[in-house]
Each structure stands twice: as structure tokens, then as C-alpha cells.
């Protein structure tokens, strides 16, 4: 007997405003339960300390979560100067205290160093793996393992304020950039040490900041559903963004209705204006219904890479 799927078949992207003090996986599981979704995944973890934008992909949208993981991010960070911790944030133990003694010119010079393309050695307190185990597990046991420097790109690093011993910055960066590491390295360049005391992700890809919703707001809506005998589809589903927003920066290739069945069965098809070596967003027919992503194959045809399961929306 086939195993019955649990939860609703609901597809879309929720822009969660994660609270501080919780893991990204905890937040993910809460969202999945609130929506009663059969499938859910996030698009790149935030530290428990951090707050802000955590896109949650539901249903078929999980097939495209990697593209949000690879997207640029933007953060607002406040660093406490004069103290260095073993985790580079306020969750760790203070390992060194020094006087704060630098000029605005020295700060400007230090900030300029981090702008553009650089190489960054990841923190030991990160989820990157060494021999199959996350680095933070080694760190908790007091073991330091070798890490290779990785290329990052800081597109913007804006000075916001310096009030007492607290420095606030706005950072727009590429995937894989560790803000805690930038903060720690900056503190060493300034000669006083520093660690993160506030970190908020304000943007992922081009998603709007104003569309975020918190777990508390979701819980209140679920309570409303139960109290007023409404449905989740009526109350929660309007919060979801279309799943193709995860790949909205890809060129759209529209496939006509007559060849759509061949494509949806996994067969390459002939289309016009197909770019070389680029993933494209595939839509069908005059309705331009999003069905997945594809790429030109060696024969110059559009080959599907990730296709969604088409369902009757009324059946969800």
C-alpha cells in the first residue's frame, strides 16, 4: 500500500522574520506546522543570535531553494568593540579585552580593506564540514582544524554609526560570507578586538523587506483560523510568494502548448532565443505558467533540469 502523504500540498515562498535565540531549523519546523505543509525547507541558516529574513520554501518551491542559497545577502550588524570572544559573537566567552584607540581615518581605511573581492577563512563556529562533521562541533571540543580561505565579495560596506563602543555597519555580500568573521577581523585591524552583538539579515536576493512575517504573527493567524472556523488557505496562503520568485533573475523561456507535453515528460525541445550556458525559467503557453528551470543541451535544445509537479490548485 502506498504511503499517504502528510500535510497539504502547498507551494510558495514565505519570507520569515526569524526571532533571535532560535535555530533556523526550529523556525522552519514551526512554519511547516502552521501551514500544515507536506514539505518545507529554508534557504541558508541564520545563527541563533541573528534575526531577519529567512525565506522558507514550501512544497514544490523546495526544488529551487538552492538558488536562494546562492543569492546575495544584506545584513545590519552591530559590533561591540574592545572585546574578542571565542565565537566572534555575544554567545561566546570573552577571551581578550583591549582599549579602544583608533581614529575615524583608521576606521575608514580598515573598512575599505573588506570591500570588493577578498579571501575569507571561515570561523570554527560555522556549519561548514570537515571530514563529515560540522566545524562548530570540533570547536566545542576545543579542537581547531584546517580551513581553506574562500573567495567572497562584499559589494557594499556602509558605516552607519559609532556610539561609544558599539559600531554599526550595513553589509551587502555574496553567499558564504561570514559576518562574524568580518567583525572579528575588523576588530583585529583596529587593534581593539570586536564581536557581534546584533545581526539582522535585511535582504535575500531581491525579496522585499516589508513582506516579512514573524512566527508570532503566524501563530496569531492560526489562532484566528481555529476561532473563526476559517481555513489555512484563506488566512495563511495569501502570505506566500509565487515559487518562481526564487529564480526570477533567470531569463524566461516560454514553451508553446503544443510541445509542452514533451517537455513535461522530461524531453528536450526546440525553442527560440535560448541562451548558452545559462539556466532559464520555463513557462507554458499564453498563461505563462511557471513549470521549472532548464538549460541548453549539447544539441542546442532546451533540456529540463528541475520541473514541478502540476496540480489542480483547487485540489490543494
Swiss-Prot record:
Looking up Gene3D superfamilies in the UniProt record yields:
Pseudouridine synthase (3.30.2350.10), PUA domain (2.30.130.10)
One Pfam family of this chain? TruB_N
In its keyword annotation, does this UniProt entry include Nucleus?
no
The GO terms describing molecular function are:
RNA binding; tRNA pseudouridine(55) synthase activity
Q: Which source organism?
A: Shewanella piezotolerans (strain WP3 / JCM 13877)
Q: Which CDD domains match?
A: PseudoU_synth_EcTruB, PUA_TruB_bacterial
Q: Which NCBIfam families match?
A: TruB
Q: What is its EC number?
A: 5.4.99.25
Q: What is this protein called?
A: tRNA pseudouridine synthase B
Q: Which gene encodes it?
A: truB
The catalytic residues are 47 (nucleophile)
Alphabetical keyword list: Isomerase, tRNA processing
Query: Which top EC class applies here?
Result: isomerase
Sorted alphabetically, which InterPro entries does this protein's record hold? PsdUridine_synth_cat_dom_sf (IPR020103), PsdUridine_synth_N (IPR002501), PUA-like_sf (IPR015947), PUA_sf (IPR036974), tRNA_psdUridine_synth_TruB (IPR014780), tRNA_sdUridine_synth_fam1_C (IPR015240), TruB_C (IPR032819)
Reactions catalysed, as given in the entry: uridine(55) in tRNA = pseudouridine(55) in tRNA
